[in-house]
Regions:
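Terminal accessory/targeting
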Residues: 1-130
């Protein structure tokens, strides 16, 4: 729950005012997972190494450590290969955006075009705010 990358609001900020546990929410991954013990993978940017273009969907504190350890996967096949070889960490949190997945060619082309444009905009936002 992080919100749109171009929004000035971060959805996680909601929990600065409200206690999600008091509302029956069991846990909030960005707050309750120890990423020193759990590797984080997300398909943001239509790839598994989308942290480069992600404004909010990332764990900056640990990303450099994961990259230095070789935990960089671009395609799903890379993740599968690492799992088969036994080099994938045993503890992983995976965040996906299934609304972007399709096996329909026209929808897939539309999604890749749109996401490519969004990634360019996100790179610019990251550069401006760095």
């Amino acid at each position: 729950m992080h919100g749109a990358p171009t929004s000035k609001w971060d959805g996680k900020d909601l929990w600065k005012k409200y206690d999600y546990r008091a509302l029956g929410v069991i846990g909030e991954p960005y707050f309750d997972v120890d990423f020193g013990q759990v590797f984080y993978l997300t398909d943001t940017g239509r790839c598994w190494d989308g942290y480069k273009v992600s404004v909010r969907d990332k764990i900056p504190r640990y990303q450099d450590e994961w990259v230095a350890a070789g935990l960089v996967y671009h395609a799903t096949d890379d993740i599968i290969r690492a799992a088969e070889e036994g080099s994938l960490p045993h503890r992983i949190m995976i965040t996906t955006h299934p609304q972007r997945w399709t096996d329909k060619r026209v929808e897939w082309v539309k999604e890749i075009f749109t996401q490519t444009i969004k990634n360019v905009v996100k790179r610019i936002l990251i550069w401006i705010t760095s």
